[in-house]
A protein has these predicted regions:
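Membrane-interface helix/loop boundary segments of multi-pass membrane proteins
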Residues: 166-192, 219-226
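Hydrophobic alpha-helical transmembrane segments
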Residues: 53-60, 133-162, 262-273
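Transmembrane alpha-helical segments in integral membrane proteins
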Residues: 61-74, 151-179, 276-285
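Interfacial transmembrane-helix boundary/kink motif in multi-pass membrane proteins
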Residues: 2-25, 50-51, 76-130, 259-271, ...
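C-terminal membrane module of polytopic membrane proteins
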Residues: 31, 235-293
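Hydrophobic core of alpha-helical transmembrane segments in multi-pass integral membrane proteins
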Residues: 20-33, 61-67, 96-102, 266-285
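Functionally important transmembrane alpha-helices
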Residues: 196-202, 206-260
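Alpha-helical transmembrane segments in multi-pass membrane proteins
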Residues: 29-74, 89-100, 120-132
Length: 293
C-alpha cells in the first residue's frame, strides 16, 4: 500500500522503517547527550532531566515524524501530520470535557493495573518489570521534584507541552497515519498506534490505562482531522500530573482530585459509560461539522 500524494508515492512499510530507524537513532543520540549532560557539574539533577526530556522529544519523536511527513507528504510534513489544520472550538471543548469525565475510570484502571501480579513461575519477569516501573517512577519524581512557581512553569512546558506535541507527532501524526493509509482499517490503526505508544513507555504496570489513553487520543485525531486536538488532550493530561506533583511538593493535599474514582468500581463504571456516550456524540458532532464546511 502506498502513502502520500500522486506525485510522491511512498510505501507504508518503508515509512515504518524510516520512523523506527529515526526512533532508534534518536534513542542512541539522546543517551549519548544525556551522558554528556551528566558530566556537567554546573547542572543539577533536575536541570539535567529537563534537558534530557527536551532532547528526547525533539530527537526521538519530532524529527522522525517530520522526516516521515516530508517523505510521504511531498515535502509538506505539517500537512501530512495534520498540523496545518486548526481545530474547531467544539473539537477542543469536547476533548477537554471527555478527559475530565473519564478521569475516575482512568484512575480506577491505573490502580487495578498496578495491583496485578504474575504467576509464581514468572516472578523473575515480574521483578524485572517492577524494576523498570520503579526506575521510570524515580525519573518522573526527579523531573517533577521542584516546588517553586518557576519549577511548575518549566515542568508544564517540558512535560506537558513538549511531550504532548512530540509524542502525538510520532504516535498519532506519523505512526497512526501510516497504519491508516497502509492497513485501510481505521480502528486497527488507532489501536496499533496506541499499543506501540503504551509499550514504548516500558511501564508495564501502567500499560492498560496508557493503551486506553492512546486510543482516546487516536480517535480524537481520526474524527477531528487535526493533530492539535490530541496534542491539547495529551498536554492537559500531562500538565494535570505535573500540577498534582507540584502541589504535593508544596504540602498541598490534592489526593482527592488525583485519585478520584480509584477506590470505587461503581464510580468508575458510571464514568466509563458516560465517557463512551460522550465519545459517540463527539464523533457525530465533528462529522456534522465537517459536512457544513
Amino acid at each position: 500500500m502506498m502513502l502520500g500524494d500522486t506525485n510522491n508515492r511512498f510505501s507504508a512499510s518503508r515509512a515504518v522503517v524510516v520512523l523506527a530507524s529515526g526512533l532508534l537513532v534518536g534513542l542512541f543520540l539522546v543517551a549519548l547527550l544525556s551522558q554528556m549532560l551528566a558530566r556537567i557539574d554546573a547542572l543539577d539533577a533536575l536541570t539535567q532531566m529537563r534537558l534530557a526530556t527536551t532532547l528526547q522529544n525533539l530527537i526521538m519523536f519530532m524529527l522522525p515524524a517530520v522526516a516521515v511527513g516530508t517523505l510521504c507528504g511531498g515535502g509538506t510534513p505539517l500537512r501530512f501530520l495534520r498540523l496545518d489544520k486548526a481545530p474547531s472550538a467544539m473539537a477542543v471543548a469536547g476533548i477537554v470535557l471527555i478527559s475530565l469525565v473519564m478521569t475516575p475510570a482512568m484512575n480506577w484502571l491505573v490502580a487495578w493495573n498496578a495491583s496485578l501480579s504474575l504467576p509464581e513461575a514468572m516472578k523473575p519477569v515480574e521483578q524485572w518489570m517492577r524494576a523498570q516501573e520503579n526506575a521510570a517512577q524515580e525519573a518522573t519524581d526527579t523531573l517533577l521534584s521542584g516546588s517553586s512557581v518557576w519549577d511548575l512553569i518549566a515542568s508544564v512546558v517540558c512535560v506537558g507541552l513538549l511531550t504532548g506535541l512530540g509524542e502525538e507527532m510520532f504516535f498519532r501524526g506519523a505512526l497512526q497515519r501510516i497504519c491508516c493509509d497502509g492497513m485501510r482499517r481505521r480502528h486497527l490503526a488507532v489501536w496499533t498506534a496506541a499499543f506501540v505508544f503504551s509499550t514504548l513507555h516500558f511501564q508495564f504496570f501502567g500499560f492498560v490505562p496508557r493503551l486506553v489513553l492512546g486510543a482516546f487520543f487516536g480517535y480524537a485525531y481520526l474524527w477531528s482531522g487535526s493533530l492539535w486536538v490530541p496534542v491539547i488532550g495529551h498536554a492537559l493530561n500531562n500538565s494535570a500530573v505535573v500540577a498534582f506533583m507540584w502541589m504535593g511538593n508544596n504540602s498541598i493535599d490534592a489526593a482527592a482530585m488525583d485519585e478520584a474514582g480509584s477506590q470505587s468500581a461503581v464510580v468508575a463504571i458510571v464514568s466509563a459509560a458516560v465517557t463512551v456516550a460522550m465519545m459517540v456524540a463527539y464523533k457525530k458532532i465533528l462529522a456534522n461539522g465537517k459536512k457544513t464546511h
